């Protein structure tokens, strides 16, 4: 800190000014003439501040944390403690990612110089991303940044390669995990959603400089969906819905470009589950909403005018009814802001599918089971009517 924050100003004794003619009280009578002149002195408030007082920090401010990151990792005895402290900080203050990630990566480049250290770093980030539900998105962004800025590249593999190897270890146990006990399934679901975030955020630069997504993750997500639908328990199906809400539009676009019909097959699996599986009514309602969402192009608005495609330039209603988001500094922005269009679309696609549920499945409307509490005793009339039509249509198709 600067010297102005290190110590309080030194205190000096107030000096009394010598009396002047203006200080004397006028004589009123002969008796008062014999009185001594009175001097008016401005009152002095004696401060209790001390030059030796400790520095003041607002409540909730961690001076050790800030000093440690200003000084790098000197105050941390191990890499694990340094990284874990930073991960916890990002979990509590995700808005600090942009301002602190560069310094974090530079510090890691000076510390992570061996295969073992790189493996430890990958494991720490993986565990944080799969054990803290709200960190899966931030963890994926962190992985993407480090994959491009960590300089170490040992024979065992660089950061991205080791990360994908760690994910593959969990992926290979998908069939057992999907039918395991509740704790095993919960851990598996956290992995599935983290892999979905990785697919959206992990950028791979090609030889010509083009940026693409990891195709291996796309294949993995397809197989993970198969595992979830093959074991149609409520929590497995909820996980599948969340994954498709998160990645469905991107997956379908990619499959269509390759001439694949994987999304059609997935929707057929969902229809079979709605008709045949013994899942709860609320979960069936969620699945029907997902089918409806997909039929509307995953909620993406592609309005067209009579003669030409609608654009911000030719359609004054282009941005009507679009939601408003806010930056980490509280500045609002909409789809009409050119500086935030890419970020806006990303947030729009990440909007929670279930308005009464947090990302970790907690019901915001009240206490109880985060997944299985009934949202309502009965379906909404509109949903119930749609459900009946859906069942009749599916039955008709079967008989054909």
Swiss-Prot record:
<dbReference type="GO" id="GO:0003723">
    <property type="term" value="F:RNA binding"/>
</dbReference>
<keyword id="KW-0810">Translation regulation</keyword>
<feature type="region of interest" description="PABPC1-interacting motif-2 (PAM2)">
    <location>
        <begin position="37"/>
        <end position="64"/>
    </location>
</feature>
<keyword id="KW-0963">Cytoplasm</keyword>
<dbReference type="GO" id="GO:2000767">
    <property type="term" value="P:positive regulation of cytoplasmic translation"/>
</dbReference>
<dbReference type="GO" id="GO:1900152">
    <property type="term" value="P:negative regulation of nuclear-transcribed mRNA catabolic process, deadenylation-dependent decay"/>
</dbReference>
<dbReference type="InterPro" id="IPR016024">
    <property type="entry name" value="ARM-type_fold"/>
</dbReference>
<dbReference type="InterPro" id="IPR003890">
    <property type="entry name" value="MIF4G-like_typ-3"/>
</dbReference>
<comment type="function">
    <text>Acts as a coactivator in the regulation of translation initiation of poly(A)-containing mRNAs. Its stimulatory activity on translation is mediated via its action on PABPC1. Competes with PAIP2 for binding to PABPC1. Its association with EIF4A and PABPC1 may potentiate contacts between mRNA termini. May also be involved in translationally coupled mRNA turnover. Implicated with other RNA-binding proteins in the cytoplasmic deadenylation/translational and decay interplay of the FOS mRNA mediated by the major coding-region determinant of instability (mCRD) domain.</text>
</comment>
<comment type="subunit">
    <text>Interacts with the RRM1-RRM2 and C-terminus regions of PABPC1 in a 1:1 stoichiometry. Interacts with EIF4A.</text>
</comment>
<dbReference type="InterPro" id="IPR051367">
    <property type="entry name" value="mRNA_TranslReg/HistoneTransl"/>
</dbReference>
<dbReference type="InterPro" id="IPR009818">
    <property type="entry name" value="PAM2_motif"/>
</dbReference>
<dbReference type="GO" id="GO:0070934">
    <property type="term" value="P:CRD-mediated mRNA stabilization"/>
</dbReference>
<feature type="region of interest" description="Disordered">
    <location>
        <begin position="356"/>
        <end position="376"/>
    </location>
</feature>
<feature type="region of interest" description="PABPC1-interacting motif-1 (PAM1)">
    <location>
        <begin position="361"/>
        <end position="400"/>
    </location>
</feature>
<feature type="compositionally biased region" description="Basic and acidic residues">
    <location>
        <begin position="1"/>
        <end position="10"/>
    </location>
</feature>
<protein>
    <recommendedName>
        <fullName>Polyadenylate-binding protein-interacting protein 1</fullName>
    </recommendedName>
</protein>
<feature type="region of interest" description="PAIP1 middle domain (PAIP1M)">
    <location>
        <begin position="78"/>
        <end position="296"/>
    </location>
</feature>
<dbReference type="GO" id="GO:0106002">
    <property type="term" value="C:mCRD-mediated mRNA stability complex"/>
</dbReference>
<dbReference type="Pfam" id="PF02854">
    <property type="entry name" value="MIF4G"/>
</dbReference>
<feature type="compositionally biased region" description="Polar residues">
    <location>
        <begin position="12"/>
        <end position="32"/>
    </location>
</feature>
<dbReference type="Pfam" id="PF07145">
    <property type="entry name" value="PAM2"/>
</dbReference>
<feature type="region of interest" description="Disordered">
    <location>
        <begin position="1"/>
        <end position="36"/>
    </location>
</feature>
<feature type="domain" description="MIF4G">
    <location>
        <begin position="80"/>
        <end position="297"/>
    </location>
</feature>
<dbReference type="GO" id="GO:0005829">
    <property type="term" value="C:cytosol"/>
</dbReference>
């Amino acid at each position: 800190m600067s010297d102005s924050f290190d110590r309080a100003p030194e205190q000096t004794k107030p000096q009394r000014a010598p009396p002047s003619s203006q200080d004397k009280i006028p004589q009123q009578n002969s008796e008062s003439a014999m009185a001594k002149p009175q001097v008016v002195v401005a009152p002095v408030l004696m401060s209790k501040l001390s030059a030796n007082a400790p520095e003041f920090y607002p409540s909730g401010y961690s001076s050790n944390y800030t000093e440690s990151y200003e000084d790098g990792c000197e105050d941390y005895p191990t890499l694990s403690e340094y990284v874990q402290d930073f991960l916890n900080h990002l979990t509590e203050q995700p808005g600090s990612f942009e301002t602190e990630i560069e310094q974090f990566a530079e510090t890691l480049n000076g510390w992570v110089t061996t295969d073992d250290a790189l493996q430890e770093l990958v494991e720490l980030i993986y565990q944080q991303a799969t054990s803290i539900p709200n960190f899966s998105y931030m963890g994926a962004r962190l992985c993407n940044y480090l994959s491009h800025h960590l300089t170490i590249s040992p024979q065992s593999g660089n950061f991205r390669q080791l990360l994908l190897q760690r994910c593959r270890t969990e992926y290979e146990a998908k069939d057992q995990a999907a039918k395991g006990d509740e704790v095993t399934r919960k851990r598996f679901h956290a992995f599935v959603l983290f892999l979905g975030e990785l697919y959206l955020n992990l950028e791979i630069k090609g030889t010509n400089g083009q940026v693409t997504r990891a195709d291996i993750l796309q294949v993995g997500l397809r197989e993970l969906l198969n595992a979830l639908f093959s074991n149609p328990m409520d929590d497995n199906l909820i996980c599948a819905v969340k994954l498709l809400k998160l990645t469905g539009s991107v997956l379908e676009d990619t499959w269509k470009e390759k001439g694949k019909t994987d999304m059609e097959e997935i929707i057929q699996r969902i229809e079979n589950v709605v008709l045949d599986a013994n899942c709860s009514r609320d979960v069936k309602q969620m699945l029907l909403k997902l089918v409806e969402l997909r039929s509307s192009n995953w909620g993406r608005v592609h309005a067209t005018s009579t003669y030409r495609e609608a654009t911000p330039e030719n359609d004054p209603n282009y941005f009507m009814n679009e939601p408003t988001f806010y930056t980490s500094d509280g500045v609002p922005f909409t789809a009409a802001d050119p500086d935030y269009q890419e970020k806006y679309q990303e947030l729009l696609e990440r909007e929670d599918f279930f308005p009464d549920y947090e990302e970790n499945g907690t019901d915001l409307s009240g206490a109880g089971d985060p997944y299985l509490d009934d949202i309502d005793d009965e379906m909404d009339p509109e949903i119930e009517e749609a459900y009946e039509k859906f069942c009749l249509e599916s039955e008709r198709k079967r008989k054909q």
